[in-house]
């Protein structure tokens, strides 16, 4: 690997209160020659929002001055974090972490491809929590069925869990199970692991 000399691609913008402290941990989607970065943004109030930057993969072509997704439910009181997105049929499905200041939970939202590609970036529909009242983060959804089912990887600390579901519907009713845990000992991955991006 070679570090890209144009880093950092995104930095906080002091004049934007919602992203004045940190920008981090983006999910990405590629459409044509553009890469859309859905990034976690934190202001000095400590609340996380999701911003959007449109890139060619190396430089930012456009960065929206307002968040495209902001907290609006009690479970999101302290933020919407760490978006992970996939295209499923005619819509984009986003799994993210809803955080109320005490409990982090996986939540889902969707937007039609038509709305998104026409620039109607705030037309998201909240789909609900994946597993209510369970501390859970780092969720990723496979965009296609495997063996007739959708697969969600997620992290109930300290391990990576998997859930299989016949449909993308929240809350997820199917059972989930650990597929990979931390290694024992004093290793770089011995405390906790997650599915990441």
Predicted regions and their residues:
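Beta-rich carbohydrate-recognition and catalytic domains
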Residues: 1-21, 25-78, 87-140, 144-194
């Amino acid at each position: 690997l070679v570090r890209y000399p144009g880093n950092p691609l995104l930095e906080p913008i002091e004049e934007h209160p919602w992203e004045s402290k940190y920008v981090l941990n983006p999910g990405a989607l590629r459409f044509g020659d553009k890469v859309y970065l859905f990034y976690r943004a934190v202001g000095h109030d400590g609340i996380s929002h999701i911003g959007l930057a449109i890139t060619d993969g190396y430089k930012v072509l456009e960065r929206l001055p307002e968040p495209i997704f902001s907290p609006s439910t009690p479970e999101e009181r302290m933020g919407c974090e760490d978006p992970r997105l996939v295209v499923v049929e005619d819509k984009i499905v986003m799994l993210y972490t809803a955080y109320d200041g005490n409990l982090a939970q996986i939540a889902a939202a969707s937007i039609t491809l038509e709305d998104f590609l026409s620039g109607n970036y705030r037309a998201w529909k909240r789909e609900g929590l994946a597993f209510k009242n369970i501390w859970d983060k780092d969720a990723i959804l496979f965009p296609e069925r495997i063996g007739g089912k959708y697969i969600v990887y997620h992290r109930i600390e300290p391990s990576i869990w998997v859930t299989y579901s016949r449909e993308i519907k929240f809350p997820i009713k199917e059972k989930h199970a650990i597929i990979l845990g931390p290694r024992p000992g004093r290793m770089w991955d011995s405390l906790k692991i997650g599915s990441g991006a």
